[in-house]
């Protein structure tokens, strides 16, 4: 689950992570009133959407007067902002964050993530702040420093100081930076986050260390422990298909391809998408049906996939362990009939009751193309979509 920058900064502020003062506004008039509450002569007017790259896309403005705050607010509110993370359709700006300006000395990047290789939380930092960390990793990976954190001990003060020295935080600000990082780690752990990222973190002319950005992703599996976090969810910022999928215990992420995928298991889903790409196709989604799919669940999965107008074919790749292939086959047949599917459909089944499942598909009389392996299925759906 994602939240807006201003919500992230409210969490930071409440847990001892230093941020500039700021207020959220929903109209140009409110933006001016909120700016008046700030003790500043310079204001930063920030578009609030669930996507990065806002600055480069024109979604962050520096205002040197209240009249400029009003001008920028009118310019941004209602505008569709297109960044490298929104896709070409962009996102409409419905709220702004009005923040105090500060005398930036230097910008940095810091982030806490879960490293799947070590199964531990990792602190990453770089003195190349203000730019995409992926770009830094690709061009100058030597400028990224990491600290792997022992889950029993947590982030140690010496690790925080070492990172601060490595990214060339001014000596007079190292202790403040270390304290900042320790507080930020506490946010990550206490709120069950999957990512906490600040880009940029800045040092100021006064020697302060501040978060000028706040990106927080929460582990959906832990949200039951954080009702206060759930209340921050902005459904208008989320894909309606993803919201619908979550209602049926389906994991769905929209992509920009044209081949819909329904798979059970996240690992198999990713392997399926990679295989489709290998044979020249483009997946339209990640959809994990989980290990307990029912006929109804399969039908809903088809409806969600077909809710994407770009989909030109569907590949179902199921390994029946807990999930029985005959149940999946019955669900596929029922779904195809209910949604009146006219697009190419390739189904690969393997595992428990696989022969019975294949017989159900064959006897249905529907235009369902079988596949014996994942590779064969991927090749078939790519070919059918290209010929359609």
UniProtKB/Swiss-Prot annotation:
GO terms for molecular function: ATP binding; magnesium ion binding; succinate-CoA ligase (ADP-forming) activity; succinate-CoA ligase (GDP-forming) activity. Residues 9-244 form the ATP-grasp domain. Keywords: ATP-binding, Ligase, Magnesium, Metal-binding, Nucleotide-binding, Tricarboxylic acid cycle. Pathway: Carbohydrate metabolism; tricarboxylic acid cycle; succinate from succinyl-CoA (ligase route): step 1/1. GO terms for cellular component: cytosol; succinate-CoA ligase complex. Its cofactor is Mg(2+). Its EC number is 6.2.1.5. Mg(2+) binds at residues 199, 213. Belongs to the succinate/malate CoA ligase beta subunit family. Succinyl-CoA synthetase functions in the citric acid cycle (TCA), coupling the hydrolysis of succinyl-CoA to the synthesis of either ATP or GTP and thus represents the only step of substrate-level phosphorylation in the TCA. The beta subunit provides nucleotide specificity of the enzyme and binds the substrate succinate, while the binding sites for coenzyme A and phosphate are found in the alpha subunit. This is Succinate--CoA ligase [ADP-forming] subunit beta.
């Amino acid at each position: 689950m994602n939240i807006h920058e201003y919500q992230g900064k409210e969490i930071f502020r409440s847990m001892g992570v230093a941020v500039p003062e700021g207020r959220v506004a929903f109209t140009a008039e409110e933006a001016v009133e909120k700016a008046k509450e700030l003790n500043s002569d310079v204001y930063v007017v920030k578009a609030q959407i669930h996507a990065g790259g806002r600055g480069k896309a024109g979604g962050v403005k520096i205002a040197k007067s209240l009249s400029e705050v009003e001008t920028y607010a009118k310019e941004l509110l209602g505008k569709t902002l297109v960044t490298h993370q929104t896709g070409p359709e962009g996102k409409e700006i419905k709220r702004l964050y009005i923040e105090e300006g500060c005398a930036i000395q230097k910008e940095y990047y810091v982030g806490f993530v879960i490293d799947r290789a070590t199964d531990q939380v990792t602190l990453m930092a770089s003195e190349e702040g203000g730019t995409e960390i992926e770009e830094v990793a690709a061009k100058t990976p030597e400028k990224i420093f990491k600290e792997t954190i022992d889950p029993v001990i947590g982030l140690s003060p010496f690790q925080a100081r070492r990172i601060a020295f490595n990214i060339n935080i001014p000596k007079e600000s190292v202790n403040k930076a270390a304290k900042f990082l320790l507080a930020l780690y506490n946010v990550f752990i206490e709120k069950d986050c999957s990512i906490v990222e600040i880009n940029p973190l800045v040092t100021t002319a006064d020697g302060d260390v501040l978060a000028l950005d706040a990106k927080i992703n929460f582990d959906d599996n832990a949200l039951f422990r954080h009702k206060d976090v759930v209340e921050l969810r902005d459904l208008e910022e989320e894909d309606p298909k993803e919201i619908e999928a979550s209602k049926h215990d389906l994991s769905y992420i929209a992509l920009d391809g044209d081949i819909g995928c329904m798979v059970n298991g996240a690992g198999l889903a990713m392997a399926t998408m990679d295989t489709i790409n290998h044979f020249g196709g483009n997946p339209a989604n990640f959809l994990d049906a989980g290990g307990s799919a029912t006929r109804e669940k399969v039908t809903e999965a088809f409806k969600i996939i077909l809710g994407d107008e770009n989909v030109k074919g569907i590949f179902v790749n199921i390994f029946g362990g807990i999930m029985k292939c005959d149940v999946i086959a019955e669900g596929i047949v029922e779904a195809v009939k209910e949604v009146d599917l006219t697009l190419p459909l390739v189904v690969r089944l393997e595992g428990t009751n696989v022969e019975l499942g294949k017989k159900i598909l064959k006897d249905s009389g529907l235009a369902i193309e079988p596949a014996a392996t994942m590779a064969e299925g991927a090749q078939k759906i790519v070919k059918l979509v290209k010929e359609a």
